[in-house]
Amino acid sequence: GRGHMTTLFASPRLFIATVDFNLEICPILVNAQEVRGCWITLDYCQEGRCEVAMPGESAIIVKPGDCCLSASRRLPSEYRYPLGRYRGIKLCFSDGVTNEPAYGVMREAGFSFGSWIEQLDPAVLFEGDDQLNALMASFEALVDPFDAPRSKLRFMEVLLHVKARGLPTGRRHSYYTKSHMRIARTTHDRLCADLGCDYRLRDIADSFGISVTSLNNYFQGVYGVPVPTYLRERRLQEAAKLLEVTDESVATIAARVGYANPSKFSAA
């Protein structure tokens, strides 16, 4: 895959990144030994979906319009983007950032990350918070060209907004266990390995010992749409690519991507 991440340090303990990736997995290039203390990350998803790792190989799935606040003393080994497409804004800061002179006003206000870190355990999801989304989106205009002073002010606005509204509580609707993630990923890989195969959801669900409804729920949670919708979209994408790069007939390409009847392919 391809893409780019622009990372800029507004201060020693705060960096801002704009992310635009067309890939599913991006390795972390920072040496874990370089990370000191507890680091807090706020991810704002604008397009695609991203995974935020949780204990036990589980994950929170961040979809467009969501912000995920997470804390960790260890960096993950990689970032994962289930749809192979992601665009977003990332703030990463140390729990000691407010000790820097630029953020003295936060200390005067008695701001502390201690209670946040206890509540995160290790992540929470803000869904549909338009004000927070607008604040996060505004960083795009501050990084090109980079405006460090205004970025620091905007960062403090973000912190004060989160402090005022409080961290989300209750059931995590976008939380998926290790088992859920394994089922969704295995199903995805099985489908994409041979788009021409005639798959039956009942057979796939039975192989995991779950219902078709559960299979679709897990898959949709990670990839955004139910299995049939995802498979149809991937088949059409592959067919469009083949039409561009080969001289094969529509009927031949239709069969290669799982449409034995060309008329059904045209209708799709």
Regions found by a protein language model. Name each.
Residues L243, T252-A255:
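Active-site pocket scaffolds in enzymes
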Residues G128-S138, R171-Y199, A205-S207, R232-E248:
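A short, Lys/Arg-enriched amphipathic alpha-helix from helix-turn-helix/homeodomain DNA-binding modules
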Residues E248-S249, K264:
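Residue-level recognition of oxygen-bearing side chains
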Residues G88-T98, S138-V143, Y199-S214:
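Long, charge-rich low-complexity segments
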Residues G114-G128, D144-S151, L159-D189, A193, ...:
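Short, Lys/Arg-enriched, Trp-marked, Pro/Gly-tolerant hinge/linker segments that flank
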Residues R2-F111:
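N-terminal regulatory/effector-sensing and dimerization cores
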Residues L91, G96-L159:
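Loop-centered beta-sheet repeat module
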Residues H161-L167, C192, C197-R234, A254-A268:
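Basic/polar phosphate-binding segments, predominantly the helix-turn-helix DNA-binding elements
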